[in-house]
């Protein structure tokens, strides 16, 4: 009997898109049940986001390893938790998937669930350890808050509430992240998508309440005509005042002073954050322009 292949065929994605269950099953006449995509971190069939639920059930019944891992030690449970696929996560748990299996950076599937409240609720209900720590010594709640962007705030508030009800406490790190989230949102509030503004603002207020964090004040931007008065007692404080009042969330500033502050900030980020990795003639032009 010929030895079966360890890798999936190049057209496996197309077969999944076609939703032909018989054709998908036929792949495993020649491939191992745990065969993987050679071009995607050795991701096995069970971990494909769009893999049909019926094929998952069939593969497990045929003997596929329900806890099979990719190059980063992520299991199918981790993959489907990442995209909030409650149905597939429920199937994997029902079939005996390891709810505490650790991927790279010591992350369990609960870390993979991120800010998705639905799959987080399911994992917690099934006994996932909310106090697990990754390699940064953060809990799933802390790790989730650390990555939240403004568009995620509403979901993050619901997810954070689940963790707090499950017994986690508002740590110093978690509170710092709430302030960061608030500062980022307020900086971009003026140009935030109005369709989601009310929902997002409500989520932010809920985060402040859950973690007992003082709300970040709304930005008061300069009107482009009044005198610009900076009152900080250090140049750093005066610079931040100028940044907050004169620099828009994107695009050029409305005043010359604001544009100088914006360019200085951009150069500062390139020097300190990127170690001049993107430094080129355009950056030098900007530096020369504000240096007089």
Model segments located where?
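Ankyrin-repeat boundary/"N-cap" motif
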Residues: 5-12, 35-50, 69-76, 102-111, ...
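Ankyrin-repeat intra-repeat helix-capping/turn positions
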Residues: 19, 51, 84, 115-117
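Ankyrin repeat (ANK) tandem arrays and their immediately adjacent linkers/low-complexity segments
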Residues: 106, 115-121, 132-292
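A broadly used, surface-exposed interaction patch
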Residues: 53, 61-64, 69-86
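Ankyrin repeat domain, specifically the short helix-to-loop turn at the C-terminus of the second helix
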Residues: 26-33, 57-65, 90-98, 121-129, ...
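Alpha-helical segment of the N-proximal tetratricopeptide repeat
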Residues: 10-20
């Amino acid at each position: 009997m010929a030895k079966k292949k360890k890798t999936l065929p190049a057209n496996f994605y197309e077969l999944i898109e076609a939703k032909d269950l018989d054709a998908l099953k036929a792949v495993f006449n020649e491939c191992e049940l745990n065969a993987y995509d050679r071009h995607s971190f050795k991701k096995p069939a069970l971990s494909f986001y769009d893999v049909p639920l019926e094929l998952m059930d069939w593969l497990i019944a045929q003997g596929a390893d329900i806890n099979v891992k990719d190059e980063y030690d992520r299991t199918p449970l981790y993959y489907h938790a990442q995209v909030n696929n409650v149905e597939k996560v429920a199937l994997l748990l029902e079939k005996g998937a390891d709810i505490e299996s650790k991927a790279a950076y010591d992350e369990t599937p609960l870390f993979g669930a991120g800010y998705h409240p639905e799959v987080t609720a399911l994992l917690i209900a099934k006994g996932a350890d909310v106090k697990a720590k990754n390699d940064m010594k953060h809990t799933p709640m802390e790790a989730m808050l650390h990555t939240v962007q403004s568009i995620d705030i509403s979901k993050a508030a619901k997810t954070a509430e689940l963790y707090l009800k499950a017994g986690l406490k508002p740590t110093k790190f978690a509170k710092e992240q709430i302030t960061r989230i608030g500062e980022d949102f307020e900086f971009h509030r003026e140009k935030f998508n109005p369709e989601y503004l009310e929902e997002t603002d409500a989520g932010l207020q809920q985060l402040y309440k859950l973690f007992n964090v003082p709300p970040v004040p709304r930005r008061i931007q300069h009107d482009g005509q009044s005198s610009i008065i900076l009152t900080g007692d250090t140049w750093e404080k005066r610079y931040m005042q100028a940044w907050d009042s004169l620099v828009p969330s994107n695009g050029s500033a409305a005043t010359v002073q604001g544009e100088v502050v914006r360019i200085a900030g951009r150069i500062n980020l390139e020097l300190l954050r990127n170690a001049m990795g993107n430094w080129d003639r355009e950056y030098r032009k900007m530096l020369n322009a504000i240096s007089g």
